[in-house]
């Protein structure tokens, strides 16, 4: 299942806030705890990849 919804994230390479569609989203949680969802994004300006937190209601996709 591909990710489709854009998410507003801060690009750490440029420092700007951009709206991007994540390449992949996965759950990151310690044992027995709720955890957070992390998304893999590609910076449109520099081409570097970075990870950022996505909303909890975002579906897990790869």
From Swiss-Prot:
GO molecular function, one term: double-stranded DNA binding
Subcellular locations according to the entry: Chromosome; Cytoplasm
GO CC terms, sorted: chromosome; cytoplasm
Alphabetized Pfam families for the sequence: Cren7
Main location, first listed in the record: cytoplasm
Keywords, comma-separated and alphabetical: Chromosome, Cytoplasm, DNA-binding, Methylation
Reported modifications of this chain: Methylated at multiple sites, to varying extents.
Function comment: A chromatin protein, binds double-stranded DNA without sequence specificity. Constrains negative DNA supercoils.
Family recorded in the similarity comment: Belongs to the Cren7 family.
UniProt subunit comment: Monomer.
Name assigned to this protein: Chromatin protein Cren7 1
Species for this entry: Hyperthermus butylicus (strain DSM 5456 / JCM 9403 / PLM1-5)
Encoding gene per record: cren7-1
């Amino acid at each position: 299942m591909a990710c489709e919804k854009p998410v507003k994230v801060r690009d750490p390479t440029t420092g700007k806030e951009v709206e991007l569609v994540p390449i992949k989203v996965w759950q990151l949680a310690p044992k027995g705890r709720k955890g957070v969802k992390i998304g893999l994004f590609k910076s449109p300006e520099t081409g570097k990849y970075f990870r950022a937190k996505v909303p909890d209601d975002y579906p897990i996709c790869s």
